Design a protein with these regions (language model features):
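Short, thiol/selenol-centered motifs that function as redox-active sites or metal-ligating centers
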Residues: 113-116
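Extended, subdomain-level signal for the structured scaffold at the beginning of enzyme domains
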Residues: 1-106, 118-130, 138-142
């Protein structure tokens, strides 16, 4: 059993965060990291008929175990970047970018869900790499 690093921030999507947390937690120790060690607010998104955009509603709260600045990425087997609105803001955190670059430099598994790819794009680790994302993030990764 090894440790997996799960990234959160205010506005992270509930499903993108909770499902990996609990599923990976069945076999690994999941450590939650964020800009600061505190409680964060997750959000839920719905695709309502007649809307061109998703509707965002408050979801659950989720506590982080560590601040990005205190994370030694060498201690972890894998990295999970949930989607939602959080990546729009998290992608500018230099400590998170350091962590992401470590995982790519060491060829460790990285799971990027939905808008999580925005963090990878800013970290400049996916140039020439085929990735999946949602259509709205297409220009971030091209």
């Amino acid at each position: 059993m090894g440790k997996v690093l799960l990234v959160v921030g205010d506005g992270a999507e509930v499903i993108d965060t909770m499902v990996p947390y609990y599923r990976l937690g069945e076999e690994h120790e999941v450590v939650v990291a964020a800009p600061e060690k505190r409680t964060y607010h997750l959000v839920q998104h719905e695709h309502d008929p007649g809307w061109d955009i998703t509707v965002e509603m408050p979801g659950y709260t989720f506590k982080s175990d560590a601040a990005f600045r205190d994370v030694d990425p060498g201690e972890f087997l894998a990295l999970v970047l949930p989607g939602g609105r959080a990546p729009e803001f998290l992608r500018y955190d230099t400590d998170l970018l350091r962590i992401v670059r470590h995982f790519f430099a060491e060829n460790k598994p990285v799971a990027s869900i939905c808008h999580g790819v925005e963090i990878l794009a800013v970290a400049d680790v996916i140039r020439g790499v085929e990735v999946t994302t949602i259509p709205r993030c297409r220009f971030d990764v091209e």
